[in-house]
Swiss-Prot record:
Its EC number is 5.4.99.22. Belongs to the pseudouridine synthase RsuA family. The keyword Lyase does not apply. Coiled coil: none annotated. This is Ribosomal large subunit pseudouridine synthase B. It comes from Yersinia pestis. It holds the Pfam family PseudoU_synth_2. It comes from the Bacteria. Responsible for synthesis of pseudouridine from uracil-2605 in 23S ribosomal RNA.
Amino acid sequence: MGEKLQKILARAGHGSRREIEAIIQQGRVSVDGKVSKLGDRVEVTQSTKIRLDGHLLSIKESEENVCRVLAYYKPEGELCTRNDPEGRPTVFDRLPKLRGSRWVAVGRLDVNTSGLLLFTTDGELANRLMHPSREVEREYAVRVFGQIDDDKIKQLSRGVQLEDGPAAFRTISYQGGEGINQWYNVTLTEGRNREVRRLWEAVGVQVSRLIRVRYGDINLPKGLPRGGWTELDLKATNYLRELVELDVETVSKLPVEKDRRRVKANQIRRAVKRHTEVSGRQVAGRQGSARKGSTRQNVGNAAPAATASRRSGPKKRG
């Protein structure tokens, strides 16, 4: 009977299921030369040819796919888009390159928000984690500017009316601060656009800093620099998969990637060592030639050589 085309493409990392459903509806996907419709089922074999805008896509059979997840520390100023017409930096710029697949972002953070952003090669996993029905908890550290009293905290906990419907924080905990700049940690179970900021603004308080520190039970890794990423191990990856009722993985590419980096590092060290040895032999050869030449010079030439040596020494910093 096969499997729905959008699920196959999502699992292969060609986008989230919602993104893929949109491009199928636009008539941009074909299977074995026939334009596909939303809801089509496909039995993937070695001879199956799926194309997007005429370009052949890499589709592995389900047992060959390995789910990978990255934790990325998004800095402020980066956009959650693959390509920006104005050439501004995006969250995809720093991610490791993939062959035959691509990273799918699990949700979004607005340009002025920093913190934890997950990426995966499994679009179905991304789609389920983002879906409001799953109620996956997100935690944010928020620095707010303004007068805050118990009534406002109660409002935010009970719920306020936003333009796109009612919203509330699941938890609010005070973290300290100075003057009217105060830090709070808040949690939500959905990811509406600018929801944290809009909730605070609804009670007359401005957000001056916003950092996502947790997604489900995955915390922003300690020591990870802004703009840095780390790949989750098999245990953490399977936690996310079980959270949204997907089959667990039995293998991980993480050890393979570590081995590749170790081999690359060893190759670099060997190249540097060879370069040092060659340079050393060349310097020794030049010095030997210079010593032989100096025996044919008279002693009066030593003073100019010493002067030249002093001139070639380190310059004073102005």
